[in-house]
Curated annotation (Swiss-Prot):
Residue intervals of the F-box domain: 41-87
Kelch repeats: from-to residues: 94-140, 182-228, 229-279, 306-350, 352-401
Domain of life: Eukaryota
Pfam family, one: F-box
Stored PROSITE patterns: FBOX
Species this protein is from: Arabidopsis thaliana (Mouse-ear cress)
Protein name per its UniProtKB record: F-box/kelch-repeat protein At1g22040
Alphabetically ordered keywords of this record: Kelch repeat, Repeat
Region (Disordered): 1-28
């Protein structure tokens, strides 16, 4: 009897142990399964995501297009601000050049250049949005006051009821700006009507989105950035009598997605014309805008197609919220127009401008000397090969602390050249020295002399597309 009881107890004990072992095994399998799932959900297996993000932030931006193809998690990781904020903390931001071109049927296309890898990327196309056209009005009041690049025939065709590419694209006559890591396309014409819409390209998301519209509709305006805010001045609007110039200005704050008014440009020189006839004939317009020494510098002209009369310019100080007349040497000496505009850029605090030659085969680069209130030549000959009647046969840009010139080469490829000038002049805006080196190139081709070296950064075949504008974004 005792042996039977002992055997029964042993069986119960064994059964209990088996149950416990089975339970422990299930727990281990569950934990292992959870660990496997956690491992699979990580960006990089065997590494915590915090470390993986550190690795991704150190990759060159040009690699991100491939990173997005790895998995949804990787695509999500490089499409958030976390990686880019970390890049900024690590000092790993990169300056890219964004070039706007106009192709077949006036279609606008954007391309981004990584100047380090010299690789180009095409941006997603801008949204196709058609805005309602105002009721048609008489052509008798229409006067052509905008630049020669403005397609007068397109406006006439739109009034006559003929279809034109601008009817399908509201970005004809748009202004371009870049602030806070975003690329902005501002205003323009849609079916001959000026619009106030603003579109933003986000390089992080690689997509376009519409942001708050301007306070006023305008086309062919000028833009500049001060204190992380985007300023828009001038341009034209369509009133009862046709297209009329604007003196108004406004500013966009990307942190609040809101526009605010800025005092209008006085155009003081236009107020002193000798008689009413000239005042009605010559229309004041802003022919450019550059942010220099913390202020907006706006060269101006009086315009009556096809003539321009330069009248200096005005300067806006955001601290005083006032416009003042531009120094005479700065305004009167601002180098010649390019299709009704004045081409300039600020690099390391120095204001440069391109002065095209009358032969259209070369030109000069000048720098503004604030102390002497004059423009001085720093590059005596700049290669220009695009002899076509395009809107912008050449562009200026500043990145990596250097001046860059964008034009077409003899094979009609878009070419980005860097000007290396050892003895770069320094104006009183950044140093007490006022010494100036005046180099001179002997040929039109990218060449090297004792004082300047033209270095080819990148080239690309855009076909028959014309250059329109360019911006630099650092993220």
């Amino acid at each position: 009897m005792g042996s039977v009881m002992s055997l029964s107890c042993s069986k119960r004990k064994a059964t209990s142990q088996d149950v416990e072992c089975s339970s422990e095994s299930r727990k281990r399998r569950k934990i292992s399964s959870e660990n496997d799932e956690e491992e699979c959900c990580r960006l990089i297996p065997s590494l915590p995501d915090e470390l993986s993000i550190q690795i991704l932030a150190r990759l060159p931006r040009i690699c991100y297009s491939s990173v997005r193809l790895v998995s949804r998690r990787w695509r999500s990781a490089v499409s958030t601000s976390e990686v880019y904020s970390l890049r900024k903390e690590l000092g790993r931001t990169e300056e890219w050049l964004y070039v706007l071109t106009k192709g077949h049927e006036d279609k606008l296309l954007w391309y981004a250049l990584d100047p380090v890898s010299t690789k180009w990327q095409r941006l997603p196309p801008m949204p196709v949005v058609v805005y309602e056209e105002e009721s048609r009005k008489s052509l008798s009041g229409l006067w052509n006051m905008i630049t020669p690049s403005f397609n007068v025939g397109a406006i006439v065709r739109s009034f006559l009821g003929r279809r034109d590419s601008s009817e399908q694209m509201p970005f004809c006559g748009c202004a371009i700006g870049a602030v806070d890591g975003g690329l902005y396309v501002i205003g323009g014409l849609s079916r001959s009507k000026t619009v106030s819409c603003v579109w933003r390209f986000d390089p992080i998301l690689n997509s376009w989105s519409e942001v708050s519209s301007m306070l006023a509709s305008r086309a062919y305006s000028k833009t500049g950035v001060l204190n992380k805010k985007l300023y828009v001045v001038g341009g034209v609007d369509r009133g009862r009598g046709g297209l009329s110039p604007l003196q108004s200005a406004e500013v966009y704050d990307p942190s609040t997605d809101a526009w605010s008014e800025v005092p209008s440009m006085p155009f003081s020189k236009a107020q002193v014309l000798p008689n009413a006839f000239l005042a009605d004939l010559l229309k004041p317009i802003a022919t450019g805008m550059t942010c220099y020494n913390g202020r907006l510098c706006v060269p101006q002209s009086l315009y009556s197609w096809p003539f321009f009369v330069d009248v200096g310019g005005e300067v806006y100080d955001p601290e005083t919220n006032l416009w003042v007349e531009m120094p005479s040497g700065m305004g009167e000496g601002w180098p010649a127009r390019q299709a009704g505009t004045k081409l300039s850029v600020v690099v390391d605090g120095e204001l440069y401008a391109f002065d095209p030659s009358s032969s259209m085969e070369n030109g000069k680069i000048k720098v503004y000397d604030q102390k002497e209130d004059t423009w001085k030549v720093v590059i005596g000959e700049v290669p220009v090969y695009d002899l076509t009647d395009s809107e912008s046969p050449y562009l200026l840009a500043g990145f990596h602390g250097k001046l860059h010139f964008i034009t077409r080469d003899p094979n009609h490829n878009v070419t980005v050249l860097r000007a290396d000038v050892p003895n770069i002049p320094v104006s009183s805006s950044s140093s007490s020295s006022s010494s100036v080196s005046i180099p001179h190139l002997k040929t039109n081709a990218p060449n090297k002399s004792d004082t300047v070296t033209w270095k080819l950064i990148a080239t690309k075949d855009f076909g028959a597309a014309e250059l329109v504008s360019c911006q630099v974004i650092d993220i």
